[in-house]
Curated annotation (Swiss-Prot):
Family: Belongs to the metallo-dependent hydrolases superfamily. CpsB/CapC family.
Gene name as annotated: cpsB
Organism this protein belongs to: Streptococcus agalactiae serotype III (strain NEM316)
Cofactor: Mn(2+)
Protein name listed in UniProt: Tyrosine-protein phosphatase CpsB
Protein's job: Dephosphorylates CpsD. Involved in the regulation of capsular polysaccharide biosynthesis.
Catalytic activity: O-phospho-L-tyrosyl-[protein] + H2O = L-tyrosyl-[protein] + phosphate
EC number in record: 3.1.3.48
Lineage, broadest ranks: Bacteria, Bacillati, Bacillota, Bacilli, Lactobacillales
Keyword Manganese attached: yes
Pfam families the record matches: CpsB_CapC (PF19567)
Length: 243
């Protein structure tokens, strides 16, 4: 499998704190069958402002150690880019990364961002000649039960991603992700999803659930659809090809 959304680089955002934590997280992903991981550390003004050279330095250490330790594993460079006018300018100047240096970029918003602001932001990114992959679309309140809005995003030329943790079955009690899981299922049933990715941060609170999610998609939507969501679509964009 291929994971295009992950926080595996130590000491740069809210992901791993140490190299060993990075490697333990990658080991679990590898155990689940992932062989390509795109590292997408946060870039968010006012919250995650680690200098780009530090992120790349720590990424390079993680890549070297992980690829040495795990056979046939590839770690690629990217970023989860929180949309602001500052981010747009940095993207234009190539100061922050797309996914594996392609024309595709992982773009994030706050849960409360309005539909109008999401639409405007994505239009602005598209005008740079960059195709947005909208991170975890199930988290945005303005898209809840709004298949027409998500269709519009896709028709504009964007792609969509949901988190593997939100594909898992709802817990009977105290499932704080219940709302996200309902939204993710809705988008899957409406065929409005291009990628499932882990958005993994650590092994205790936000681990990868790709193996379990893959089984559920196979069971409910078929193996062909599962392979598109977990492997084939990601293969395309990482080679800089449209889906």
């Amino acid at each position: 499998m291929i994971d295009i959304h992950s926080h595996i680089v130590f000491d740069v955002d809210d992901g791993p704190k140490t190299l060993e934590e990075s490697l333990s997280l990658i080991e679990e992903s590898y155990r689940q069958g992932v062989r390509i991981i795109v590292s997408t550390s946060h870039r968010r003004k006012g919250m995650f402002e680690t200098p780009e050279d530090i992120i790349f330095k720590n990424f390079s250490i993680v890549k070297h150690e992980a690829e040495k330790r795990f056979e046939h594993l590839q770690i690629l460079y990217g970023g989860e880019l929180y949309y602001t006018s500052d981010m747009l300018e940095k993207l234009k100047l190539k100061q922050i990364p797309t996914l594996n240096n392609t024309k595709f970029a992982l773009i994030e918003f706050s849960m409360q961002t309005s539909w109008k602001d999401i639409h405007t932001a994505l239009s602005n990114v598209l005008m740079l000649g960059i195709t947005p992959v909208v991170a975890h679309i199930e988290r945005y309140n303005s898209l809840e039960n709004q298949k027409e809005r998500v269709k519009e995003i896709i028709n504009m030329g964007c792609y969509t991603q949901i988190n593997s943790s939100h594909i898992l079955k709802q817990k009977l009690f105290n499932d704080k992700h219940k709302r996200f899981k309902k939204r993710a299922r809705y988008f899957l049933e409406e065929n409005l999803v291009h990628f499932v990715a882990s958005d993994m941060h650590n092994l205790d609170v936000r681990p990868p659930f790709l193996a379990e999610a893959y089984k559920i998609i196979c069971r409910d939507f078929g193996k062909e659809r599962a392979n598109q969501l977990f492997i084939e679509n990601a293969q395309s964009i990482l080679k800089n090809h449209y889906i």
